[in-house]
Amino acid sequence: MSRSVKKGPFVDKKLYKRVVEMNKAANQRNKKVIKSYSRCSTIIPEMVGFTISVHNGKSWIPVYITEEFVGHKLGEFSPTRVFRGHSGSDKKVGR
């Protein structure tokens, strides 16, 4: 079930505060990387153009936010598991 429209998208308060402060900054060229543990935060239009490092449980994955990302969650772009592939050929040798 999706989130109610009247509630609006969820964005961590601390993350939202950092984004708003950086948008208000006079020098837009010095956009620093924002670190966030909040994988469940929804990407909103104010975040476009920022690089947000999302923690995957082990390391920080930098995610550059573009317009296509709006509406998705931050956790979708930092995988937590590594798929190493299936085992090699398991063909039976002669019968």
UniProtKB/Swiss-Prot annotation:
GO molecular-function terms, A-Z: rRNA binding; structural constituent of ribosome
One GO biological process term: ribosomal small subunit assembly
Keywords assigned by UniProt, alphabetized: Ribonucleoprotein, Ribosomal protein, RNA-binding, rRNA-binding
Flavoprotein as UniProt keyword: no
InterPro entries recorded: Ribosomal_uS19, Ribosomal_uS19_bac-type, Ribosomal_uS19_CS, Ribosomal_uS19_SF
SUPFAM superfamilies linked: Ribosomal protein S19
Recorded GO CC terms: cytoplasm; small ribosomal subunit
PANTHER family from the UniProt entry: RIBOSOMAL PROTEIN S19P FAMILY MEMBER, SMALL RIBOSOMAL SUBUNIT PROTEIN US19M
Record family assignment: Belongs to the universal ribosomal protein uS19 family.
Protein name: Small ribosomal subunit protein uS19
Taxonomic source organism: Treponema pallidum (strain Nichols)
